[in-house]
Amino acid sequence: IEALVSAGIRDIGVVVGDTQAEIRSAVGDGSAWNIKVTYIEQDEPRGLAHAVSISQDFINGSPFVVYLGDNLLNHGIGTFVEEFLQNPPAAQILLSHVTNPEMFGVAELSDGKVTRLVEKPKTPMSDLALVGVYMFGPEVFTSVKRISPSSRNELEITDAIQDLIDRGLIVRPHIVKGWWKDTGKLEDILEANRLILKTFEQRIDGHVDANSLIEGKIVIDADAIIERSVVRGPAIIGARAKIIDSHVGPYTSIMNDVVIKNSEIENSIVLEQSLISDLATRVTDSLIGKNVRIHYRKSTSQAYSFMLGDNSEVNIS
């Protein structure tokens, strides 16, 4: 959402399915970003092109961006949107050079235009992967109606884009500058966290007692408390978080209202209102959801690694 807002977009439709309660709770009505949010319900996963199709009334003839929510871009999409609007093609797709194109949908180019899209090619003719950010004019709705479901019974956006190409319409590439992360896997989320933390400027608005050590680039939000602890940056400690008798960082994001007590954690993300206490072994390379409780009892290993959902509780013995 922040990437869309930074590009000047103020009217956002969010296509939701069976996880819509969590998304509605996190996004709300958009007032936190001074935007308008409309929720568009998709009864079951039928593909990205289907999601575009059911959004036609919301789009109402305007050019529009399709942004897959698990993508993170270093420089946002401002220049991508500007380029489209200056000379609108039928579609414009965001691409990134990758070292393993056989793992992605890949675009082939000629004379500055996209000529073919190939999903996970065995012998790639290009190293340009589809990032998962697209911009379209109204012609795409005709293409969505012309395509058939894929082998997984979904309407694929790549098929709709290929139909635009086959009908002689212009599909323009836009190459990502800076890093791009698809955060669909734990290691990608943690790498994105590391990259973002490196961009922060030092800021300490919370309380750090005289018995604590702060090293490196740290952000400590208002009303956070650090007592008898070591925090090594890059790291962020959210509002009202409490770090007591603990070692946090580097490359660690502690969100609002989290309590870390008598524990060590590094290269990890801990979401809101979670508690980690009395762990004799370091937590590393972990993503811990909201309102999670992790308590120590007994352990013989040298490190823990977790990927825990919201409202989880782990008792280690």
Protein language model annotation of sequence segments:
Residues 1-68, 72-79, 86, 298, ...:
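Conserved N-terminal catalytic core of the sugar/cofactor nucleotidyltransferase
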Residues 13-17, 94-95, 269, 287:
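Short internal beta-strands
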Residues 13-14, 66, 91-94, 173:
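Structural beta-sheet core signal
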Residues 23-27, 144, 192:
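Hydrophobic packing residues within well-ordered alpha-helices of enzyme cores
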Residues 36-38, 113, 170-172:
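Conserved beta-strand segments of alpha/beta enzyme cores
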Residues 70, 97, 185:
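Active-site glycine-centered loops adjacent to acidic/histidine catalytic or metal-binding residues
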Residues 73-148:
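Conserved core of the sugar-phosphate nucleotidyltransferase
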Residues 139, 146-317:
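Left-handed beta-helix
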